[in-house]
C-alpha cells in the first residue's frame, strides 16, 4: 500500500483504527451507519451524525475533502483510517467504502463504545 495522503489528517493509528472499525461493524448491524460520502454529507446536514470516518487511500482524495470542512462547521469529530477496503468490510459491504457516518441513537446498545471512540477522535483533533 502506498503512503497515506498528507491531506488525510487526522489519521488513526493501528489500535484506534481497529477500535473504529469494530464500532463501525456493530453500528452496521444495528442500522446506525450510513455508507458513502454523499450519505455522510446528508447526516451532517441533518445533524444526526456522531462522527465521520473517511478512507485515507481514497483516489483522488479531493472527493472527500468537503467533509472535514462540514464537520468543523457542525462540531462533529472526524477521522481518517488507512484503508477503504477495510472500511468497506467493516460496513458489511463487498465494495470499498471511502466515507461512513455513525448516526445518533440515544437508545443504542453500543452508545458507550461510540462515545469512547468519539473521545479518542476528539483528542486527535487537538
Swiss-Prot record:
It holds the Pfam family Ribosomal_L7Ae. PROSITE patterns: RIBOSOMAL_L7AE (PS01082). It is found in: Nucleus, Nucleolus. Keywords: mRNA processing, mRNA splicing, Nucleus, Ribonucleoprotein, Ribosome biogenesis, RNA-binding, rRNA processing, Spliceosome. GO terms for biological process: box C/D sno(s)RNA 3'-end processing; maturation of SSU-rRNA; maturation of SSU-rRNA from tricistronic rRNA transcript (SSU-rRNA, 5.8S rRNA, LSU-rRNA); mRNA splicing, via spliceosome; snoRNA guided rRNA 2'-O-methylation; spliceosomal complex assembly. GO terms for cellular component: box C/D methylation guide snoRNP complex; nucleolus; nucleoplasm; nucleus; precatalytic spliceosome; small-subunit processome; spliceosomal complex; U4 snRNP. One of its GO terms (molecular function) is U3 snoRNA binding. InterPro entries: eL8/uL1-like, H/ACA_rnp_Nhp2-like, Ribosomal_eL30-like_sf, Ribosomal_eL8-like_CS, Ribosomal_eL8/eL30/eS12/Gad45, Ribosomal_eL8/Nhp2. It comes from the Eukaryota. Changing residue 84 to A: Impairs binding to U4 snRNA, but not U3 snoRNA, and causes pre rRNA processing defects and an accumulation of unspliced U3 snoRNA. Binds to the C'/D and B/C motifs in U3 snoRNA. Component of the U4/U6-U5 tri-snRNP complex composed of the U4, U6 and U5 snRNAs and at least PRP3, PRP4, PRP6, PRP8, PRP18, PRP31, PRP38, SNU13, SNU23, SNU66, SNU114, SPP381, SMB1, SMD1, SMD2, SMD3, SMX2, SMX3, LSM2, LSM3, LSM4, LSM5, LSM6, LSM7, LSM8, BRR2 and DIB1. Binds to the 5'-stem-loop of U4 snRNA. Component of the ribosomal small subunit (SSU) processome composed of at least 40 protein subunits and snoRNA U3. Common component of the spliceosome and rRNA processing machinery. In association with the spliceosomal U4/U6.U5 tri-snRNP particle, required for splicing of pre-mRNA. In association with box C/D snoRNPs, required for processing of pre-ribosomal RNA (rRNA) and site-specific 2'-O-methylation of substrate RNAs. Essential for the accumulation and stability of U4 snRNA, U6 snRNA, and box C/D snoRNAs. Belongs to the eukaryotic ribosomal protein eL8 family. This is 13 kDa ribonucleoprotein-associated protein. It comes from Saccharomyces cerevisiae (strain ATCC 204508 / S288c) (Baker's yeast).
Amino acid at each position: 500500500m502506498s503512503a497515506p495522503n498528507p491531506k488525510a489528517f487526522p489519521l488513526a493509528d493501528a489500535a484506534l483504527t481497529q477500535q473504529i472499525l469494530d464500532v463501525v461493524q456493530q453500528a452496521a448491524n444495528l442500522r446506525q451507519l450510513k455508507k458513502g460520502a454523499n450519505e455522510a454529507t446528508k447526516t451532517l446536514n441533518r445533524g444526526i451524525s456522531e462522527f465521520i470516518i473517511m478512507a485515507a487511500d481514497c483516489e483522488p482524495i479531493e472527493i472527500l475533502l468537503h467533509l472535514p470542512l462540514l464537520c468543523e462547521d457542525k462540531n462533529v469529530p472526524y477521522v481518517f483510517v488507512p484503508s477503504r477496503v477495510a472500511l468497506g468490510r467493516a460496513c458489511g459491504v463487498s465494495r470499498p467504502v471511502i466515507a461512513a457516518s455513525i448516526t445518533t441513537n440515544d437508545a443504542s446498545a453500543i452508545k458507550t463504545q461510540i462515545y469512547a471512540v468519539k473521545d479518542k477522535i476528539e483528542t486527535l483533533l487537538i
